Amino acid sequence: MATYKVTLINEAEGLNKTIEVPDDQYILDAAEEAGIDLPYSCRAGACSTCAGKLISGTVDQSDQSFLDDDQIEAGYVLTCVAYPTSDCVIETHKEEELY
């Protein structure tokens, strides 16, 4: 099992933290375990409350059912169903930008 460094950033929220996330754990769950308060609602990849934007790196979010291909192409991720597949940087609190 691999573990990746996931950096969560959001200037408006004063957030800039790097956490270690195993490749079989969702990023949102790992953030909560580390005491980082991220927005979420359904926890099933079916809404946009937990949306973030991938600045660098890669994730597997094949369990999500909300984002369309254009949004995924633009780098949006649903942290509640995203597994890291490399070290990555994610800008959090991005739900508003989807609309």
From Swiss-Prot:
Residues 4-96 form the 2Fe-2S ferredoxin-type domain. SUPFAM superfamilies: 2Fe-2S ferredoxin-like. Binds 1 [2Fe-2S] cluster. One of its GO terms (biological process) is electron transport chain. InterPro entries: 2Fe-2S_ferredoxin-like_sf, 2Fe-2S_ferredoxin-type, 2Fe2S_fd_BS, Beta-grasp_dom_sf, Fd_pln. Gene3D superfamilies: 3.10.20.30. Ferredoxins are iron-sulfur proteins that transfer electrons in a wide variety of metabolic reactions. PANTHER family: FERREDOXIN, FERREDOXIN-2, CHLOROPLASTIC. Belongs to the 2Fe2S plant-type ferredoxin family. This is Ferredoxin. It comes from Mastigocladus laminosus (Fischerella sp.).
